[in-house]
Amino acid sequence: MINSNDRQSTLVVAMSGGVDSSVVAGILCEQGYNVIGITLQLYDHGMATAKKNACCAGQDIYDAKMVANKLGMPHYVLDYESKFKESVIDNFVDSYLRGETPLPCVQCNKSVKFRDLIKTAKELGADKLVTGHYVRKINGDNGPELHMGLDPLKDQSYFLFATTKEQLEYLDFPLGALTKDETRKLASKFGLEVADKPDSQDICFVPDGNYKNVINKIRPNASESGKILHINGFELGTHSGIINYTIGQRRGLGISYHEPLYVIKIDPNSNIVYVGPESALNVQEFVIKDVNWLAGSLKDGEKLEVSVKVRSTRPPRLAEISKLEGDRMKVKFLSEEKAVAPGQACVIYDGTRVLGGGWITRDVIPA
Protein backbone atom coordinates (compact mmCIF):
# COMPACT_ATOMS: atom_id res chain seq x y z
CA MET A 1 0.00 0.00 0.00
CA ILE A 2 2.91 2.34 0.66
CA ASN A 3 5.19 3.37 -2.18
CA SER A 4 8.33 2.16 -0.46
CA ASN A 5 10.07 -1.19 -0.62
CA ASP A 6 12.32 -0.38 2.32
CA ARG A 7 10.81 -1.82 5.47
CA GLN A 8 13.35 0.21 7.44
CA SER A 9 11.62 3.40 6.34
CA THR A 10 10.33 5.67 9.08
CA LEU A 11 6.74 6.72 8.53
CA VAL A 12 4.77 9.30 10.49
CA VAL A 13 1.04 8.65 10.82
CA ALA A 14 -1.27 11.58 11.47
CA MET A 15 -3.48 10.09 14.20
CA SER A 16 -6.76 11.85 14.96
CA GLY A 17 -7.94 9.20 17.40
CA GLY A 18 -10.51 7.90 14.91
CA VAL A 19 -10.77 4.49 13.32
CA ASP A 20 -9.29 5.49 9.94
CA SER A 21 -5.91 6.80 11.06
CA SER A 22 -5.73 4.08 13.72
CA VAL A 23 -6.10 1.39 11.05
CA VAL A 24 -3.41 3.09 8.96
CA ALA A 25 -1.05 2.80 11.93
CA GLY A 26 -2.02 -0.85 12.33
CA ILE A 27 -1.39 -1.63 8.66
CA LEU A 28 2.05 -0.02 8.71
CA CYS A 29 3.08 -1.71 11.95
CA GLU A 30 1.95 -5.07 10.55
CA GLN A 31 4.02 -4.45 7.43
CA GLY A 32 7.11 -3.87 9.55
CA TYR A 33 7.77 -0.17 9.11
CA ASN A 34 9.18 2.10 11.80
CA VAL A 35 6.00 3.97 12.65
CA ILE A 36 5.64 7.17 14.66
CA GLY A 37 2.19 8.45 15.57
CA ILE A 38 1.54 12.17 15.88
CA THR A 39 -1.69 13.67 17.17
CA LEU A 40 -2.33 17.38 16.91
CA GLN A 41 -4.16 19.14 19.71
CA LEU A 42 -6.01 21.74 17.70
CA TYR A 43 -8.56 23.32 19.99
CA ASP A 44 -10.11 23.24 23.44
CA HIS A 45 -13.72 24.36 23.50
CA GLY A 46 -14.94 22.68 26.67
CA MET A 47 -17.84 20.50 25.55
CA ALA A 48 -16.22 19.73 22.22
CA THR A 49 -13.23 18.02 23.80
CA ALA A 50 -15.44 15.31 25.26
CA LYS A 51 -17.66 14.72 22.23
CA LYS A 52 -17.41 11.26 20.73
CA ASN A 53 -17.71 12.56 17.18
CA ALA A 54 -15.19 15.39 17.39
CA CYS A 55 -11.52 15.06 16.49
CA CYS A 56 -8.14 16.33 17.65
CA ALA A 57 -9.33 17.13 21.18
CA GLY A 58 -9.35 15.51 24.65
CA GLN A 59 -11.01 12.11 24.20
CA ASP A 60 -9.54 11.64 20.75
CA ILE A 61 -6.01 12.32 21.94
CA TYR A 62 -6.52 9.67 24.62
CA ASP A 63 -7.86 7.21 22.02
CA ALA A 64 -4.88 7.81 19.73
CA LYS A 65 -2.48 7.21 22.60
CA MET A 66 -4.27 3.96 23.52
CA VAL A 67 -4.04 2.76 19.91
CA ALA A 68 -0.32 3.55 19.81
CA ASN A 69 0.21 1.65 23.05
CA LYS A 70 -1.71 -1.32 21.66
CA LEU A 71 0.44 -1.35 18.53
CA GLY A 72 3.68 -0.78 20.44
CA MET A 73 4.67 2.37 18.57
CA PRO A 74 5.87 5.77 19.78
CA HIS A 75 3.26 8.51 19.91
CA TYR A 76 3.55 12.26 20.37
CA VAL A 77 0.98 14.97 20.97
CA LEU A 78 1.81 18.37 19.51
CA ASP A 79 0.10 21.57 20.62
CA TYR A 80 -1.02 23.26 17.40
CA GLU A 81 -3.83 25.31 18.93
CA SER A 82 -2.38 28.69 18.02
CA LYS A 83 -1.55 27.59 14.46
CA PHE A 84 -5.01 26.08 14.05
CA LYS A 85 -6.74 29.22 15.30
CA GLU A 86 -4.70 31.45 13.01
CA SER A 87 -4.94 29.28 9.88
CA VAL A 88 -8.40 27.74 10.24
CA ILE A 89 -10.69 29.24 12.89
CA ASP A 90 -9.92 32.91 12.17
CA ASN A 91 -10.26 32.23 8.44
CA PHE A 92 -13.59 30.48 9.08
CA VAL A 93 -14.93 33.46 11.03
CA ASP A 94 -13.70 36.09 8.58
CA SER A 95 -15.13 34.12 5.65
CA TYR A 96 -18.62 34.31 7.16
CA LEU A 97 -18.16 38.05 7.74
CA ARG A 98 -17.36 38.38 4.02
CA GLY A 99 -20.71 36.77 3.23
CA GLU A 100 -19.08 33.52 2.17
CA THR A 101 -19.69 29.87 3.05
CA PRO A 102 -16.33 28.67 4.43
CA LEU A 103 -14.76 25.25 4.09
CA PRO A 104 -12.54 24.81 7.17
CA CYS A 105 -11.59 21.18 6.46
CA VAL A 106 -9.74 22.21 3.30
CA GLN A 107 -7.94 25.01 5.14
CA CYS A 108 -6.94 22.57 7.88
CA ASN A 109 -5.61 19.98 5.42
CA LYS A 110 -3.84 22.66 3.39
CA SER A 111 -2.08 24.34 6.26
CA VAL A 112 -1.98 22.63 9.63
CA LYS A 113 -2.25 18.96 8.69
CA PHE A 114 -0.07 19.04 5.61
CA ARG A 115 2.15 22.12 5.57
CA ASP A 116 2.99 22.17 9.28
CA LEU A 117 2.80 18.44 9.97
CA ILE A 118 4.94 17.57 6.95
CA LYS A 119 7.56 19.96 8.27
CA THR A 120 7.44 18.22 11.65
CA ALA A 121 7.63 14.77 10.05
CA LYS A 122 10.71 15.75 8.07
CA GLU A 123 12.33 17.14 11.21
CA LEU A 124 11.81 13.69 12.76
CA GLY A 125 13.60 12.11 9.81
CA ALA A 126 10.49 10.43 8.42
CA ASP A 127 10.38 9.24 4.82
CA LYS A 128 6.63 9.75 4.46
CA LEU A 129 3.60 11.27 6.16
CA VAL A 130 0.70 8.83 6.01
CA THR A 131 -2.94 9.73 6.65
CA GLY A 132 -6.32 8.03 6.84
CA HIS A 133 -7.96 9.98 4.02
CA TYR A 134 -10.04 8.06 1.51
CA VAL A 135 -8.14 9.12 -1.61
CA ARG A 136 -5.64 7.38 -3.86
CA LYS A 137 -2.17 8.39 -4.91
CA ILE A 138 -1.34 6.84 -8.28
CA ASN A 139 2.01 7.12 -10.02
CA GLY A 140 1.47 8.62 -13.48
CA ASP A 141 3.80 9.37 -16.36
CA ASN A 142 4.63 12.79 -14.90
CA GLY A 143 4.72 11.91 -11.23
CA PRO A 144 2.14 11.12 -8.56
CA GLU A 145 -1.51 11.86 -9.22
CA LEU A 146 -4.31 12.44 -6.72
CA HIS A 147 -7.42 10.34 -7.38
CA MET A 148 -10.81 9.79 -5.80
CA GLY A 149 -11.13 7.02 -3.24
CA LEU A 150 -12.68 3.85 -4.66
CA ASP A 151 -15.59 4.05 -2.22
CA PRO A 152 -17.79 6.91 -3.53
CA LEU A 153 -19.50 7.18 -0.14
CA LYS A 154 -16.22 7.98 1.62
CA ASP A 155 -14.20 9.73 -1.09
CA GLN A 156 -12.43 12.78 0.38
CA SER A 157 -10.67 14.09 -2.72
CA TYR A 158 -12.77 17.27 -2.71
CA PHE A 159 -11.19 18.26 0.60
CA LEU A 160 -7.62 17.64 -0.60
CA PHE A 161 -7.62 19.67 -3.82
CA ALA A 162 -5.21 22.22 -2.29
CA THR A 163 -2.51 19.58 -1.77
CA THR A 164 0.56 20.73 -3.67
CA LYS A 165 2.69 18.56 -5.94
CA GLU A 166 5.52 18.68 -3.42
CA GLN A 167 3.22 17.63 -0.58
CA LEU A 168 1.74 14.82 -2.66
CA GLU A 169 5.22 13.40 -3.23
CA TYR A 170 5.67 13.04 0.53
CA LEU A 171 2.18 11.76 1.37
CA ASP A 172 0.57 8.32 1.22
CA PHE A 173 -3.04 7.19 1.69
CA PRO A 174 -3.38 3.45 2.39
CA LEU A 175 -7.19 3.52 2.77
CA GLY A 176 -7.97 4.85 -0.71
CA ALA A 177 -8.88 1.43 -2.08
CA LEU A 178 -10.95 0.36 0.95
CA THR A 179 -14.55 0.81 2.04
CA LYS A 180 -15.40 1.99 5.54
CA ASP A 181 -16.67 -1.48 6.43
CA GLU A 182 -13.34 -2.98 5.38
CA THR A 183 -11.53 -0.41 7.51
CA ARG A 184 -13.61 -1.26 10.57
CA LYS A 185 -12.97 -4.99 10.02
CA LEU A 186 -9.24 -4.29 10.00
CA ALA A 187 -9.61 -2.30 13.23
CA SER A 188 -11.27 -5.33 14.83
CA LYS A 189 -8.56 -7.60 13.46
CA PHE A 190 -5.89 -5.40 15.07
CA GLY A 191 -7.84 -5.41 18.35
CA LEU A 192 -8.37 -1.65 18.38
CA GLU A 193 -11.03 -0.30 20.72
CA VAL A 194 -11.91 2.44 18.23
CA ALA A 195 -13.27 -0.10 15.71
CA ASP A 196 -16.85 1.08 16.27
CA LYS A 197 -16.10 4.71 17.02
CA PRO A 198 -18.41 7.13 15.11
CA ASP A 199 -16.97 9.25 12.32
CA SER A 200 -15.95 12.80 13.18
CA GLN A 201 -18.08 15.80 12.31
CA ASP A 202 -17.12 18.09 9.40
CA ILE A 203 -16.52 21.13 11.62
CA CYS A 204 -14.63 19.63 14.52
CA PHE A 205 -14.13 22.85 16.50
CA VAL A 206 -17.79 23.92 16.65
CA PRO A 207 -19.51 22.64 19.83
CA ASP A 208 -23.01 21.30 19.18
CA GLY A 209 -22.88 22.56 15.60
CA ASN A 210 -23.55 26.16 16.67
CA TYR A 211 -20.96 27.97 14.57
CA LYS A 212 -22.56 31.34 15.35
CA ASN A 213 -21.37 31.14 18.95
CA VAL A 214 -17.81 30.59 17.74
CA ILE A 215 -18.05 33.59 15.42
CA ASN A 216 -19.55 35.89 18.04
CA LYS A 217 -16.93 34.86 20.59
CA ILE A 218 -14.09 35.81 18.25
CA ARG A 219 -15.81 38.75 16.54
CA PRO A 220 -18.31 40.19 19.10
CA ASN A 221 -19.84 42.62 16.60
CA ALA A 222 -20.47 39.99 13.93
CA SER A 223 -24.27 39.90 14.24
CA GLU A 224 -25.04 43.36 12.88
CA SER A 225 -28.62 43.69 11.64
CA GLY A 226 -29.41 44.76 8.09
CA LYS A 227 -31.95 44.62 5.27
CA ILE A 228 -33.34 41.64 3.41
CA LEU A 229 -34.15 42.71 -0.15
CA HIS A 230 -35.82 40.88 -3.00
CA ILE A 231 -33.54 40.70 -6.03
CA ASN A 232 -36.09 42.95 -7.77
CA GLY A 233 -35.22 45.69 -5.28
CA PHE A 234 -38.02 45.87 -2.72
CA GLU A 235 -37.50 45.33 1.01
CA LEU A 236 -38.94 42.24 2.70
CA GLY A 237 -37.58 42.51 6.22
CA THR A 238 -34.46 42.67 8.35
CA HIS A 239 -31.83 40.14 9.33
CA SER A 240 -29.80 39.75 12.53
CA GLY A 241 -26.43 39.33 10.81
CA ILE A 242 -25.20 37.99 7.47
CA ILE A 243 -23.41 35.18 9.33
CA ASN A 244 -26.84 33.53 9.65
CA TYR A 245 -27.23 33.07 5.89
CA THR A 246 -25.70 31.08 3.07
CA ILE A 247 -26.35 30.91 -0.67
CA GLY A 248 -29.29 28.63 -1.46
CA GLN A 249 -30.75 28.79 2.05
CA ARG A 250 -34.55 28.59 2.21
CA ARG A 251 -35.46 27.93 5.84
CA GLY A 252 -35.06 30.39 8.68
CA LEU A 253 -35.12 33.55 6.56
CA GLY A 254 -37.49 35.29 8.96
CA ILE A 255 -39.71 36.71 6.21
CA SER A 256 -43.00 35.81 4.57
CA TYR A 257 -43.86 35.93 0.87
CA HIS A 258 -46.38 34.41 -1.54
CA GLU A 259 -43.77 32.01 -2.98
CA PRO A 260 -40.72 30.19 -1.59
CA LEU A 261 -37.65 32.40 -1.43
CA TYR A 262 -33.97 31.51 -1.31
CA VAL A 263 -30.80 33.41 -0.46
CA ILE A 264 -29.38 34.48 -3.82
CA LYS A 265 -26.63 36.90 -2.83
CA ILE A 266 -24.99 38.30 0.30
CA ASP A 267 -23.39 41.75 0.13
CA PRO A 268 -21.07 42.28 3.13
CA ASN A 269 -20.28 45.87 2.17
CA SER A 270 -23.89 47.05 2.38
CA ASN A 271 -24.85 44.32 4.89
CA ILE A 272 -27.76 43.24 2.67
CA VAL A 273 -29.11 39.74 2.10
CA TYR A 274 -30.77 39.33 -1.30
CA VAL A 275 -33.47 36.70 -1.78
CA GLY A 276 -35.43 35.47 -4.78
CA PRO A 277 -37.12 32.49 -6.43
CA GLU A 278 -35.34 29.18 -6.85
CA SER A 279 -34.75 29.87 -10.54
CA ALA A 280 -32.49 32.79 -9.57
CA LEU A 281 -30.03 30.31 -8.04
CA ASN A 282 -29.12 28.94 -11.47
CA VAL A 283 -25.51 29.69 -12.42
CA GLN A 284 -23.85 29.31 -15.81
CA GLU A 285 -20.29 30.39 -15.07
CA PHE A 286 -18.07 31.76 -12.32
CA VAL A 287 -14.45 32.53 -11.46
CA ILE A 288 -12.20 30.73 -8.99
CA LYS A 289 -9.06 32.11 -7.36
CA ASP A 290 -5.95 30.75 -5.63
CA VAL A 291 -5.99 27.82 -8.04
CA ASN A 292 -3.85 24.83 -7.14
CA TRP A 293 -3.06 22.92 -10.35
CA LEU A 294 -1.69 19.39 -10.18
CA ALA A 295 -1.70 18.45 -13.88
CA GLY A 296 1.09 19.98 -15.94
CA SER A 297 0.60 23.60 -16.94
CA LEU A 298 -2.04 25.70 -18.66
CA LYS A 299 -1.46 28.85 -20.70
CA ASP A 300 -3.58 31.98 -20.27
CA GLY A 301 -6.72 31.57 -22.37
CA GLU A 302 -6.29 27.81 -22.77
CA LYS A 303 -9.56 25.89 -22.39
CA LEU A 304 -10.20 22.36 -21.18
CA GLU A 305 -13.34 20.22 -20.86
CA VAL A 306 -13.49 18.66 -17.41
CA SER A 307 -15.91 17.75 -14.64
CA VAL A 308 -16.18 19.87 -11.50
CA LYS A 309 -17.68 19.68 -8.02
CA VAL A 310 -18.81 22.86 -6.27
CA ARG A 311 -19.95 21.11 -3.07
CA SER A 312 -18.56 17.98 -1.46
CA THR A 313 -21.96 16.28 -1.48
CA ARG A 314 -22.77 16.98 -5.13
CA PRO A 315 -21.82 14.77 -8.08
CA PRO A 316 -19.31 16.11 -10.62
CA ARG A 317 -20.78 18.24 -13.43
CA LEU A 318 -19.40 18.70 -16.93
CA ALA A 319 -17.79 22.09 -17.46
CA GLU A 320 -15.27 24.03 -19.49
CA ILE A 321 -12.44 25.77 -17.70
CA SER A 322 -10.26 28.51 -19.11
CA LYS A 323 -7.05 29.86 -17.61
CA LEU A 324 -7.13 33.51 -16.62
CA GLU A 325 -4.25 35.75 -15.66
CA GLY A 326 -2.49 34.83 -12.43
CA ASP A 327 -3.96 32.07 -10.30
CA ARG A 328 -7.56 32.45 -11.50
CA MET A 329 -9.77 30.35 -13.77
CA LYS A 330 -13.19 30.75 -15.35
CA VAL A 331 -15.52 27.79 -15.00
CA LYS A 332 -18.48 27.43 -17.39
CA PHE A 333 -21.03 24.67 -16.81
CA LEU A 334 -22.22 22.79 -19.89
CA SER A 335 -25.60 22.72 -18.13
CA GLU A 336 -26.53 25.18 -15.39
CA GLU A 337 -25.91 24.47 -11.68
CA LYS A 338 -27.69 25.80 -8.60
CA ALA A 339 -26.43 27.73 -5.59
CA VAL A 340 -22.74 28.21 -6.34
CA ALA A 341 -21.52 29.75 -3.08
CA PRO A 342 -18.51 32.07 -2.71
CA GLY A 343 -16.06 30.64 -0.19
CA GLN A 344 -16.68 27.05 -1.22
CA ALA A 345 -14.24 25.08 -3.36
CA CYS A 346 -14.54 24.16 -7.01
CA VAL A 347 -12.59 20.95 -7.56
CA ILE A 348 -11.66 19.95 -11.10
CA TYR A 349 -11.56 16.31 -12.21
CA ASP A 350 -10.61 14.22 -15.22
CA GLY A 351 -12.44 11.00 -14.43
CA THR A 352 -11.25 10.05 -10.96
CA ARG A 353 -8.15 12.24 -11.11
CA VAL A 354 -8.02 15.57 -9.29
CA LEU A 355 -6.56 18.07 -11.73
CA GLY A 356 -6.75 20.92 -9.25
CA GLY A 357 -9.19 23.40 -7.85
CA GLY A 358 -9.71 26.83 -6.39
CA TRP A 359 -11.97 29.02 -4.28
CA ILE A 360 -15.26 30.31 -5.68
CA THR A 361 -15.31 34.11 -5.89
CA ARG A 362 -18.17 36.61 -6.13
CA ASP A 363 -17.72 36.69 -9.92
CA VAL A 364 -20.76 34.47 -10.48
CA ILE A 365 -22.80 34.89 -13.66
CA PRO A 366 -26.47 33.80 -13.44
CA ALA A 367 -27.88 31.45 -16.06
From Swiss-Prot:
One of its GO terms (molecular function) is tRNA-uridine 2-sulfurtransferase activity. Its EC number is 2.8.1.13. It catalyses: S-sulfanyl-L-cysteinyl-[protein] + uridine(34) in tRNA + AH2 + ATP = 2-thiouridine(34) in tRNA + L-cysteinyl-[protein] + A + AMP + diphosphate + H(+). The keyword Signal does not apply. Keywords: ATP-binding, Cytoplasm, Disulfide bond, Nucleotide-binding, RNA-binding, Transferase, tRNA processing, tRNA-binding. Belongs to the MnmA/TRMU family. This is tRNA-specific 2-thiouridylase MnmA. It comes from Rickettsia bellii (strain OSU 85-389).
